[in-house]
Curated annotation (Swiss-Prot):
GO terms for molecular function: acylphosphatase activity. It comes from the Bacteria. The keyword Chloroplast does not apply. Keywords: Hydrolase. Its EC number is 3.6.1.7. It holds the Pfam family Acylphosphatase. This is Acylphosphatase. Belongs to the acylphosphatase family. The keyword Hydrolase applies.
Length: 98
């Protein structure tokens, strides 16, 4: 068995966060939180002022990240978080900011 053991149930979720989430360090804080939870994927700004992310990892860590995204860093004001599971065979290598 590998030390990585990514064969446990890995889930992938697409997330959209709306509110005051650009220009406040939201993506940087999201990367830090994702690294702390050992999640993989990415986070990016969208032209409409929202932030999108792809989260990949075990369900308990995904749930913790979704809970964190509902408020984000203290500099942000989150008004809405939507998410949906996106089953995929693709495995991200790390979590990064786009």
């Amino acid at each position: 068995m590998s030390g990585d053991d990514l064969d446990e149930r890995i889930e992938t979720y697409y997330v959209r966060v709306r509110g005051v989430v650009q220009g406040v360090g939201f993506r940087h804080a999201t990367v830090r939180e994702a690294h702390a939870l050992k999640l993989r994927g990415w986070v990016a700004n969208l032209d409409d002022g929202s932030v999108e992310a792809m989260l990949q990892g075990p369900a308990p860590q995904i749930d913790r990240m979704l809970a964190w995204l509902r408020h984000g860093p203290s500099t942000a004001h989150v008004t809405e978080v939507t998410f949906e599971e996106r089953p995929t065979d693709k495995r991200f290598e790390r979590f990064q900011q786009h």
